Amino acid sequence: MSGRGKGGKVKGKSKTRSSRAGLQFPVGRIHRLLRKGNYAQRVGAGAPVYLAAVMEYLAAEVLELAGNAARDNKKSRIIPRHLQLAIRNDEELNKLLSGVTIAQGGVLPNIQAVLLPKKTQKAAK
C-alpha cells in the first residue's frame, strides 16, 4: 500500500516565462544575462520580465515607424535609412537615441530657409 504517496502533482507541459508573461522576447535569456553581467549580486524574479517587456515595446515602436517609412518610400523591406528616418522624426525616440549613430542611415532632408529661392510677387493686372 505504501510507496506511492497521496497522488503527487502531475507535471504538465512546461511553459516558458515569456509565454506566461505574454511576451516574445526571451525572459530566461535576459535573466541569465543579468546574472552573468555583474549588474547586482542578486536579480529578482520580476526584473527580467519587466526588462523584456520594455525592450519588446521599444522594438515594436521602432519597427512600426520604420515600416511606415518604408511604405512611404514604396519599399517592402526595412533598411537602415528607414530606421534613421523613423527615429529622427519621432521626438521621444530621437531624444532617447540622440547619441546613437545608425550605419548607412544618412541624414534628415533639411534645407535652410535662407537658401530657398525668393518668392517673387507678380503685379496683378
Swiss-Prot record:
It is found in: Nucleus; Chromosome. One of its GO terms (molecular function) is protein heterodimerization activity. Coiled coil: none annotated. The modification N-acetylserine is found at residue 2. Keywords: Acetylation, Chromosome, DNA-binding, Methylation, Nucleosome core, Nucleus. InterPro entries: Histone-fold, Histone_H2A, Histone_H2A/H2B/H3, Histone_H2A_C, Histone_H2A_CS. Pfam families: Histone (PF00125), Histone_H2A_C (PF16211). The keyword Acetylation applies. One of its GO terms (cellular component) is nucleus. Transmembrane segments: none annotated. Residues 1-18 have a biased composition (Basic residues). Its main location: nucleus. Residues 1-23 are annotated as: Disordered. The modification N5-methylglutamine is found at residue 104. Core component of nucleosome. Nucleosomes wrap and compact DNA into chromatin, limiting DNA accessibility to the cellular machineries which require DNA as a template. Histones thereby play a central role in transcription regulation, DNA repair, DNA replication and chromosomal stability. DNA accessibility is regulated via a complex set of post-translational modifications of histones, also called histone code, and nucleosome remodeling. The nucleosome is a histone octamer containing two molecules each of H2A, H2B, H3 and H4 assembled in one H3-H4 heterotetramer and two H2A-H2B heterodimers. The octamer wraps approximately 147 bp of DNA. PANTHER family: HISTONE H2A (PTHR23430). Belongs to the histone H2A family. This is Histone H2A.
